[in-house]
Amino acid sequence: MHSIAIFGGTFDPVHNGHIKTSLAIQANFGFDSYYFLPCKSPAIKPPSFASSEQRVEMLKLALKPYPDFKIDTRELDRDTPSYMVYTLQSFRQEYTDSSLTLIIGYDGLLNLPQWYQWEKIISLANLLVINREEFFQQPVPKSVQTLLNQYRNDDKNILLNHHAGSICLYNAGHYDISSTKIREQLKQHKDVKNNLPDLVYDYIKKQELYQ
């Protein structure tokens, strides 16, 4: 069975944490296809700071050394907000016989009940939840705990060989990097070069982004 991983985010900007996390995931799971999915206008997050075109360009630059990583722009190409359930339905229509795995952070898991039609997501894809140590002490919503009790299975073969319906928690490494922090540091003219791919850093400076 063809296995597909979908890593969604604003990538505003894409940073080394995104890349290192993805490399760790691929080293452990080895998905046949791995897509970075830039969101258009997340319904439960503030609007992005860079334009859609700029965010895609930064992704292209960041992924140049990694030809196995692809970019999927279907959310940017839609006129509607970035509702993940619609995106997964679109993937499922295109890849009817493949396993789909949506990669989210542990914070995303805790916020899952806030997602539009979130109950449908587990029927459309598996969930690969990246463990974030700082969230471990937060109470898990009852609805999410019910999902974990019913669907959690940390066997990677389940993700690779089942169309949907499993939740796997995986420690992909801890990287103290966030797009929010990078934007704040750039605005304060602090050095962020070590947290960004070189080509992305050069692009941000050239475009004078996040000033």
Swiss-Prot record:
Keywords assigned by UniProt, alphabetized:
ATP-binding, NAD, Nucleotide-binding, Nucleotidyltransferase, Pyridine nucleotide biosynthesis, Transferase
Species of origin: Legionella pneumophila subsp. pneumophila (strain Philadelphia 1 / ATCC 33152 / DSM 7513)
State one Pfam family annotation: CTP_transf_like
Q: What are the protein's GO molecular function terms?
A: ATP binding; nicotinate-nucleotide adenylyltransferase activity
What is this enzyme's class at the first EC digit?
A: transferase
Q: What does this protein do?
A: Catalyzes the reversible adenylation of nicotinate mononucleotide (NaMN) to nicotinic acid adenine dinucleotide (NaAD).
Protein name per UniProt: Probable nicotinate-nucleotide adenylyltransferase
Give a yes or no for keyword Hydrolase in this entry.
no
Lineage runs: Bacteria, Pseudomonadati, Pseudomonadota, Gammaproteobacteria, Legionellales
Describe which pathway this protein belongs to, using the record's wording. Answer: Cofactor biosynthesis; NAD(+) biosynthesis; deamido-NAD(+) from nicotinate D-ribonucleotide: step 1/1
NCBIfam families, A to Z: cyt_tran_rel (TIGR00125), nicotinate (nicotinamide) nucleotide adenylyltransferase (TIGR00482), PRK00071.1-1 (NF000839)
| Family per record | Belongs to the NadD family.
Q: Which GO terms describe its biological process?
A: NAD biosynthetic process
